[in-house]
Structures are given as C-alpha cells and as structure tokens.
Amino acid sequence: MSTANPPADLVEMWTDGACKGNPGPGGWGVLMRYGSHEKTFFGGDPQTTNNRMEILAVVEGLRALKRACTVVIHTDSQYVMKGMTEWLPNWKRRGWLTADKKPVKNAELWQLLDAQVARHEVRWQWVRGHNGDPGNEMADMLANQGVASVARN
C-alpha cells in the first residue's frame, strides 16, 4: 500500500498455498506485518488441493488477528482474488451454486473466508508469484514448510 499516512491499525499480510500433487499433501503460509512487528506461521493437510491451501492461508491469517484491522492481503492466487472480489456475491445470491447450477467448489472454505473478511477492512493486492516479491517468497517458503510438516516420505 502506498498511502502517505497509512491507518494506525494497518496489517499487511502475504499468503500462499502449496501442494505436492494436486490432490496431495499441501501447506499454507502467512507472513504478517504490523508496524515493526512481524509474525510467520504455517500449517498443512496430508490430502488436499492447492486451491484449498490458498484459501486456508488467508482464513488462518485473518483468524490470527485479535481485533478488527485494516488489512492489505497480498496473494499470488487469482483464484482467491477473483473469488473474493468477483465471484462471491453471485455465489451467495445463488445459494452457493455456480452459474451452471453446480455446487461451488470449496464452499465451506469460502464461507469461512467470507466470515473472516467481514471482521476487517480488507484490501486485496495481487502479486506475481515467484517473481522476487520478498513477502510472497517468504509466504511460499512457509507454505512449503506446511507441506513438509504433513508429507509422507
């Protein structure tokens, strides 16, 4: 975010998901910055998809915030970006069905994310993955730690 006077409660968050095999063992990672404070965390699921991990990264990042904040979420996931900024209102209006009248994939995670986003003032920022953005690179590394934490050898 490039405002001259950012809000005092501004949290910047970089999120990423990873999956080895799709489906397969997956992980999510979050880098969070609040002023001079930084926090990183990750998790994993032994049998999941990349898209589920991308959504879960944002859910877990927002869940970690104890009070309402202004949050800038940096993600390299077009799926998450478009889901939250374009598709969500239509899914909700149609009772969680797509335009083709099929159930929305990962609806339970989208509903969790929608509830978490409602607690905050959220701004979405897309970043190109694996392109040198330090926050995105850290989130990617954390997501891969999440994979490693659940992967079977």
From Swiss-Prot:
UniProt record, GO biological process: DNA replication, removal of RNA primer
Which reaction is this enzyme known to catalyze?
Endonucleolytic cleavage to 5'-phosphomonoester
Q: How is the cofactor bound?
A: Binds 1 Mg(2+) ion per subunit. May bind a second metal ion at a regulatory site, or after substrate binding.
Per the record, its GO cellular-component terms are: cytoplasm
Highest taxon of the lineage: Bacteria
Q: Where does Mg(2+) 2 bind?
A: 16, 140
Cysteine pairings via disulfide bonds: none
- Essential cofactor(s): Mg(2+)
MF (Gene Ontology): magnesium ion binding; nucleic acid binding; RNA-DNA hybrid ribonuclease activity
Q: Does the keyword Lyase apply?
A: no
Record localization:
Cytoplasm
Question: Which EC class is the enzyme in?
Answer: hydrolase
Major subcellular location class: cytoplasm
Quaternary structure, from the entry:
Monomer.
The protein's matches in NCBIfam families, at most eight in alphabetical order, are given as: PRK00203.1 (NF001236)
Q: Which HAMAP family match?
A: RNase_H (MF_00042)
To which protein family does this belong? Belongs to the RNase H family.
Tell me, in a sentence or two, what this protein's role is: Endonuclease that specifically degrades the RNA of RNA-DNA hybrids.
Q: What name appears for this protein in its UniProt entry?
A: Ribonuclease H
* Gene source species: Bordetella avium (strain 197N)
- Which lineage is the organism of this entry classified under, starting from the top rank? Bacteria, Pseudomonadati, Pseudomonadota, Betaproteobacteria, Burkholderiales
